[in-house]
C-alpha cells in the first residue's frame, strides 16, 4: 500500500510539473494567476529539494520572460538554494543539472558583476551532472548555451553546436529539452544569417510550444543580444 501511494504521489508531481511547464513555455497566452495556480498545484506533490528547485526554476523563467527581474531572481535564488542543499547531501545528476540551469538564467536577471562572478561556474556544475549521467540533456544544454549565448571571450557558436548535435543524437529529450534545442539551433542559424534553416528549426519548435514569446521573436528573425553591458567585441563566433 505504501509503495502504491508513493508511486501515485510521484505520478501526481510529474503530471503537475508537466502542466506548469506547458503554461510557462506558452507564455504569450499565460497569465500570472495561471502560473501561480499551477506552481502551487505542483508544490503540493514536491517530495524532495530537486523537485522544489525545478518548479522554482520554471516560475523564475516565467517572470524573466515577462521582464520582472526581481521576481525572476527571487525564484532562481530559491532554486539554487534547494538544488545546492540537495547535491551537498545527495549528489545526483538532477541536482547539479538544475543548479547549472538556474545559475545560468540567474546571470541574465542579476547585475553584470553577478554574471562575471558566477557565469563561469555554470560549466563546472553541468559537467558534474554529466559525470553522473552522460545523457543528461539539460546539463548538455547548459554547456552549449555557455558557448552560444555567452558574451566575449566565451562565445563560440561552433563549440556550442557540436554539443547540441552530440546530445540530440544520443540522449532522450523531454518536450522542453526539444523545444530549447530547436530554438537554439534557430538562434544560431539567424546569427549566421541562414534564415531558411532557422525557419526549419522554428517550425519544429512551434509544434511543441506554439505560444512562446522567444519563439515568436525568433519567427520575426529577431533575437536578444546577451551580455550587452559587457564587452563583446572579441566574441569568438566561428
Where do the language-model regions lie?
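Extended amphipathic alpha-helical interaction segments
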Residues: 115-176, 180
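Surface-exposed, polar helix/loop patches in the mature regions of secreted/periplasmic/lumenal proteins
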Residues: 78-131, 200, 206, 216, ...
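Terminal, low-structured helical/coil segments at or just beyond the last alpha-helical repeat
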Residues: 176-187, 191-238
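Sec/Tat signal peptide C-region and signal peptidase I cleavage site
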Residues: 6-10
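Helix-turn-helix repeat elements of alpha-solenoid scaffolds
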Residues: 24-40, 69-82, 115-123, 154-165
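Bacterial N-terminal signal peptides
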Residues: 1-5
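Structural marker of alpha-solenoid helical repeat scaffolds
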Residues: 45, 88-89, 132, 170-174, ...
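Amphipathic alpha-helical repeat scaffolds of TPR domains
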Residues: 12-23, 44-65, 90-110, 135-151, ...
